[in-house]
Amino acid sequence: MNGTFFNHTVFTHGVLLNRSQELAGTLVDCCTGNGSEVTANDGGGSLVLAQDERKLFVTRVVQIAVLCVLSLTVMFGIFFLGCNLMIKSESMINFLVKDRRSSKDVEAVMIGLS
C-alpha cells in the first residue's frame, strides 16, 4: 500500500514538473521570439486570430468594459453621496443657527461696546 502510494506521488510529481517545464518553455519562446509568431496576411494591416484566441480576446474586452463601467458607477456614487451629505450638513447647520438664541450677556456686551 505504501509502495503504490509513493509511486503514485512520484508519478504525479513528475507530470507536474513536465507541465511546468512546458509552460516555462512556452513563456521563454514567446518572449524571445523563437516560438510560433502571429503573422499578418495583408502586410501588417490586420491579424488573423484563431477561433479560441478570438473568443479569449472578446471575453477580455467585455471584462475590461464591464470593469470600467462599474468603476465609473462607484466613483459617481461616491461623488454624489458626498455632495448629498454636504448639502444636508449645510442645511442642518443653517437650521441650528436659526434656532440659536443669543444670551443676555452677549446683548449687554454689545450695548456696552456701542
UniProtKB/Swiss-Prot annotation:
It is found in: Membrane. One of its GO terms (cellular component) is membrane. The chain crosses the membrane at residues 61-81. It is a single-pass membrane protein. The keyword Membrane applies. Keywords: Membrane, Transmembrane, Transmembrane helix. It comes from the Eukaryota. InterPro entries: Reprimo_fam. Belongs to the reprimo family. This is Reprimo-like protein. The lineage of its organism: Eukaryota, Metazoa, Chordata, Craniata, Vertebrata.
